[in-house]
């Protein structure tokens, strides 16, 4: 399913890229698809594989038809490391600009992992006019920025889950728990990154506060943290019936134990 979606997205973006780049794309031996993201993390690694599978399928059929000429696709990836602990946004932006300048991709897919990097990187995408199909970063901040200047950011698209919709899903889950078990005391633990802060804050504001839940605490954790014992002890001591975790880092799996 994901491969078919990526395949369709690539074909669509090739059309857009051809319209934008024109003769420059046609003169190349192959059409370069850039994949700048956090390759060391599951989401980035699997997304990169999906792009490779999709392009292999396209190339096996002869490539894509560009003005009557069949052209093969070439995938070029770079590890932005923006999801890794301690990596500043400017460092990730250097990687994004480097792949554009050195590899000259006709289009970019997947894109930055962390929302902070995506929002800041939108200006780089706009500067070089490279169409980008983002599939990971979730903060609604990128949409707000696009709406502020749609002409400037018209090359940027996002197909993944928006944190706003995740709020609705989580609120629905909490409502079900309340209905089925009568629980109404929650302890919130979230990663200290844009999408997770927004998600935790909006669930509290839009659901917990209105539905009469008692929020016993909200703890934010830097990316890479693996010790959650202090908050768990607080949650137990205060009588929490539900813990709502909002993370994307692999270390959060420790909470299951």
Question: What residues fall within each predicted segment?
Answer:
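Beta-alpha junction/loop-to-helix N-cap segments that form part of ligand/metal-binding clefts
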Residues: 28, 43-49, 64-147, 159, ...
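Extracytoplasmic ligand/sensor domains, especially the bilobed periplasmic-binding protein
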Residues: 105-218
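Short, polar/charged alpha-helical segment
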Residues: 44-66, 201-208
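Extracellular/periplasmic bilobed ligand-binding domains
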Residues: 120-129, 200-257
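Boundary at the C-terminal end of the N-terminal hydrophobic targeting segment
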Residues: 19, 25-29
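Bacterial N-terminal signal peptides that target proteins for export
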Residues: 1-10
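Bacterial N-terminal signal peptides
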Residues: 9-21
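Short beta-strand segments enriched in small/hydrophobic residues
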Residues: 29-57, 112, 185-190
